[in-house]
């Protein structure tokens, strides 16, 4: 079996994501090398922070094309938090174009009375692709851990894999299209449910090898 690459582009602490993957049964390789991404059997793109620095850091490391090629080649791919948002065409938070792998935009939560932004803490997922391999073994409407002020708004509603409701706003919490999966919440901070999701991804990686 080859290796799973966790992309390091200076956007947040990769330690907890890697620890979660190790618990799920795989030893990830942290890398910012285009060649590693080309050779990897599967890819995880984590990240916390702001949209513009994230895409700038990816492009300055020449990682945009290897990421696009890996997804096009059918390699299992998991984006986490900011790693979901930069797959889209752009963000209300910044001016830089995103990777544009998924059509749509990243939007900010609308202000509401008594609504806290960022959306932070435990909240329930509602599955929109309930048969997704990533969700295997989870109870319906599981609680996972969120920290975000922006959410993705895909043009094609069929890429939605789960939604979450914050105040009166129900927004995308996860997307899935073929081998490409990405989540707004933090599986590595989501206790048993998060570990189950990472384990499901690792199972897909092993089945794909």
Model-derived features: positions:
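Acyltransferase
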Residues: 183-209
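An anion/phosphate-binding loop that grips the pyrophosphate of nucleotide cofactors and donors
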Residues: 40
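Pocket-forming structural segment of enzyme catalytic cores
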Residues: 90-167
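Cysteine-nucleophile active-site neighborhood
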Residues: 49-120
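Extreme N-terminal starter segment of soluble prokaryotic enzymes
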Residues: 1-5
């Amino acid at each position: 079996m080859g290796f799973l690459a966790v992309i390091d582009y200076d956007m947040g602490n990769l330690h907890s994501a890697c620890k979660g993957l190790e618990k799920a049964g795989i030893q990830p390789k942290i890398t910012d090398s285009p060649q590693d991404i080309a050779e990897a059997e599967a890819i995880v793109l984590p990240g916390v922070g702001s949209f513009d620095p994230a895409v700038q850091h990816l492009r300055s490391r020449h990682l945009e094309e290897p990421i696009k090629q890996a997804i096009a080649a059918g390699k299992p791919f998991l984006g986490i938090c900011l790693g979901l948002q930069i797959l889209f065409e752009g963000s209300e938070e910044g001016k830089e174009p995103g990777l544009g792998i998924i059509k749509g935009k990243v939007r900010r939560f609308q202000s509401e009375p008594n609504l806290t932004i960022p959306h932070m803490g435990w909240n329930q997922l509602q599955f929109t692709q309930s048969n997704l391999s990533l969700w295997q073994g989870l109870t319906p409407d599981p609680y996972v851990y969120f920290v975000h002020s922006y959410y993705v708004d895909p043009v094609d509603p069929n890429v939605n894999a789960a939604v979450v409701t914050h105040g009166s706003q129900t927004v995308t919490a996860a997307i899935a299209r073929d081998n490409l999966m990405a989540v707004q919440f933090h599986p590595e901070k989501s206790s048993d449910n998060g570990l189950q999701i990472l384990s499901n991804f690792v199972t897909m990686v092993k089945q794909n090898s």
